[in-house]
Amino acid sequence: MIGNFSCETDEIKRIVLNFALQVQKKFPSNFQKNKKRIIVIAGPTCCGKSALALNLAQTMDGEIISADSMQVYRGMDIGTAKATKEERLFVPHHLIDIRDIQESFNVVDFYYEARQACQKILDQGNVPIIAGGSGFYLHALLYGPPSGPPSVPEVRKSFEDEIERLGSEILYERLSQLDPQYAKTITKNDKQKIVRALEIMMLTNKKVSKLSWKGRRKPQNYDFRCWFLHRPKEKLYERIDKRCDKMLEEGFMDEVRHLDSLGIRGNSSASQAIGYRQALNFLKTEQTASQYQEFIRSFKQATRHYAKRQFTWFRKEPLFRWLDVDMHDPEVVFDMILKDYELL
């Protein structure tokens, strides 16, 4: 197990201390001794977050909280690279398989359920380890949920009907005109966020970019020890392509067909998830060999684009220390995070 590795070099200690001091200067209150520590492992898809979180949890009596917006859904297993049942036997996992595919789950749900899980784990004397790549969800966990108004079903339904009738690109263009700053943070295919943004602006007469996180740039309650794992783009993209191929070999299309029979298309969030959206579109075609190859191409391309957006998002997150996992051995990465956690 990597956790038995000991790396007591002065260089590792120096790097860890330097990382900690950088964050402490920006957020001195985050390092108050009376605050309980929580490890956060983020990064783009295919960078090794899950393996590292498992290793840390096995070593330090940790429990893992998923920060993946789709792993909450039962049945979305292969396409979300969900922890296996065997892995969940060794280490307790939270916020996995907690919703049926027909149910909704949003950032506010995540905030309250993740905070509840953190406190429960701490009360048991264990270490919460949050792992995932959803920047929006992690931002909410660190600073508090978005301050937008509660959803109004009638208003939301009108926008959902309109986006189905006109297409997401038309409503995305409308959003870009009303709030170009927020529009740049999402894609034209993200129907759920487009609809929610338009709903918020109709209800508040304010731009989402001016509303969502105003006045909440201070970490809440806990001492979050945040890390962003990354690799050089070329190597990351190569790993992404291989993972997509592996998912298909493991039966991803059968998984999507089953979810389709359960009504995934009625879930505007789950049906737009990377891989699932492309697979559902393919299932509506004649499913020829050339159309299948086009599906694979779009699946890989969408995953690479998502990884790029993850880099963009986390560059704006001051609490996260970046670690090039291609530059450092896994043992060194593990030891750095462990020593940082032990640093008071």
Swiss-Prot record:
Residues 68-71 are annotated as: Interaction with substrate tRNA. It comes from Protochlamydia amoebophila (strain UWE25). The keyword ATP-binding applies. It comes from the Bacteria. This is tRNA dimethylallyltransferase. Substrate binds at residues 45-50. Monomer. NCBIfam families: miaA. GO terms for molecular function: ATP binding; tRNA dimethylallyltransferase activity. It is an enzyme of class 2 (transferase). Belongs to the IPP transferase family. ATP binds at residues 43-50. The keyword Transferase applies. Its cofactor is Mg(2+). InterPro entries: Dimethylallyltransferase, IPT, P-loop_NTPase. HAMAP family: IPP_trans. Its EC number is 2.5.1.75. Pfam families: IPPT. PANTHER family: TRNA DIMETHYLALLYLTRANSFERASE. It catalyses: adenosine(37) in tRNA + dimethylallyl diphosphate = N(6)-dimethylallyladenosine(37) in tRNA + diphosphate. The lineage of its organism: Bacteria, Pseudomonadati, Chlamydiota, Chlamydiia, Parachlamydiales.
